[in-house]
C-alpha cells in the first residue's frame, strides 16, 4: 500500500510546501507530532516535503524504480504508524533516511540481490553547455561511475550520505547506526580510495 492510497484528502493551496495560511513554515517536528495524533493532512505535507529526496536515496540503493517506490511506501507507512516513537534526537529527515536505508537493504536481502550505485555519479546535463562541454561531462560521469562501482558498499554508503544527501557526520552515524569516529574513518578511506581510482583512470579528483 502506498502513501497516496491510505491518505486521501483535499489539500488547501499552499499546504504541500508546509506553509500555514499565515505564511509560516510548519516544522517537521510539529508535523510528526500531528501525525502521531492521526492528522492525515500533516502526513501529506511531510510526504510532499521529503518524498523526492527519500525516493532518490532509495533508488541509488536498489537501482530499480519499482523497488524504490515500494521502499517509499514502506517508509511513509512506518512514519504513519510509528510517529509517536520519534525521539527528536536527530532531524526528521535523518530518521526518514535511516528507515529508507533499512527498508532498502532488507528488500535487497529478501530478493537475494546486490545493488551497485550507478546513478549517483551521473552528471546532470546543463542545457547551456556547448556540445564539447557536454561530451566532457558525459566522459567524466562514466569514469566516475566506474570508479564508484569499485568502492565497497560501506564506502559508497558514506559518500552518498555526505556528498549527495549533504548529511553531517552525526546524522550519518545515526542513519547507518555506527559511531561518529567510525563514520570519519570510513569517510577518510572512502575518499582516499576514490581518489586513487580516479587517478588511475586518468582523472584526478578536484
Please provide the spans of the model-predicted regions.
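Conserved RNAP core-binding helix
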Residues: 31, 47-48, 55, 65-82, ...
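Arg/Lys-rich amphipathic alpha helix in sigma70-family domain 2
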Residues: 81-88, 98-118, 137, 189
Amino acid at each position: 500500500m502506498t502513501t497516496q492510497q491510505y491518505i486521501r484528502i483535499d489539500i488547501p493551496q499552499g499546504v504541500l510546501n508546509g506553509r500555514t495560511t499565515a505564511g509560516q513554515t510548519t516544522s517537521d517536528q510539529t508535523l510528526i507530532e500531528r501525525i502521531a495524533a492521526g492528522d492525515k493532512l500533516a502526513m501529506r505535507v511531510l510526504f510532499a516535503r521529503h518524498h523526492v529526496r527519500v525516493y532518490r536515496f532509495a533508488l541509488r540503493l536498489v537501482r530499480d524504480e519499482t523497488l524504490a517506490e515500494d521502499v517509499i511506501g514502506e517508509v511513509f507507512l512506518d512514519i504513519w504508524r510509528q510517529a509517536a516513537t520519534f525521539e527528536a534526537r536527530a532531524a526528521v529527515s535523518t530518521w526518514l533516511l535511516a528507515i529508507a536505508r533499512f527498508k532498502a537493504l532488507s528488500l535487497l536481502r529478501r530478493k537475494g540481490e546486490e545493488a551497485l550505485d550507478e546513478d549517483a555519479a551521473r552528471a546532470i546535463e546543463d542545457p547551456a553547455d556547448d556540445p564539447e562541454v557536454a561530451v566532457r561531462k558525459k566522459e567524466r560521469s562514466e569514469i566516475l561511475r566506474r570508479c564508484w562501482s569499485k568502492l565497497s558498499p560501506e564506502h559508497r554508503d558514506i559518500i552518498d550520505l555526505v556528498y549527495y544527501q549533504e548529511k553531517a557526520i552525526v546524522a550519518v552515524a545515526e542513519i547507518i547506526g555506527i559511531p561518529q569516529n567510525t563514520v570519519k574513518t570510513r569517510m577518510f578511506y572512502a575518499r582516499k580510495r576514490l581518489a586513487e581510482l580516479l587517478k588511475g583512470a586518468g582523472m584526478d579528483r578536484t
